[in-house]
Amino acid sequence: MNNDNHTSTLSGKAVYIVTGATDNMGSIISRRLAEQGKPVVLACRNLEKAEAFADKLKSKTRNSDVQCLLLDLSSFEMVNDFVERVKALNRPVAALINNAGTLPRHSRISPDGYEHTIQVNFLSTVLLSLAIYPLMIEGGRIILSTSISRHLASLPYEFPAVSHFTQIGAYAQSKLALTLFSIYMSTVMKTGRVSVNCVNPGVIKTGVLALHRWLDRAADYLVNPLPDPEAGVIPTMRALESNDTGFIFEGRDKQIKTSTMLKNRDVFIKLCNDTMRIIKKHLPHDATPQ
């Protein structure tokens, strides 16, 4: 899959983008990449917090190639603003690690007219991934964060519209949709030069996965216990090192085909068509899928 000459020429300059890079798992992923000497782009909503974290990383890892760019996934316009900032770096992208996510207790509508959880966790993440794809090196990585909660979800006919909001329901639907759409990205789009994988960090001690319902947390813990964010980043680091595509990485050694989530082909086709109909309106011209 790799073009060795192309990769050897560019990989020294290619950046690793981590979304949600300052909190919990994102900060650990960023630190590990910086420790490896990778050029890291911290993609965050709070630039002041990101700059302070970047200074800390540079000091602790002695890696000066750490920088911050503003990214807010709550609207398509702000996603595209971020992509333009990445282009302005004049550097290729080695990996896009889609770590950012949200789990609000209450529903609200995004500036684009979608439920906020669905916009951030699914639609804007898809837009970001497709817009960054043309900037990536041969052998690049797109990593999408899924959740065990995807097994609790089904996608209603009106999705991505949400007719009835529940906290875990919207979150689970966003993660199921993202997992299924990764099949489209890794196979239907034939993105052979870039691998597309999902990672499931398990239930860990982070704010975003605190479901505020003891039953959900207890059930998840019994299925896939991981005690802290350090353990939760293991699947991401494994996916970064793997040449495989179309997989879900879990824990220290588990790896399953994403296609195992494909239970209803009609639902899958509708999801892909509806999602691309929305996303194509906001994609840069050079990122429009063939």
Label the predicted regions:
Residues 101-109, 115, 141-193, 200-213:
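Catalytic loop of short-chain dehydrogenase/reductase
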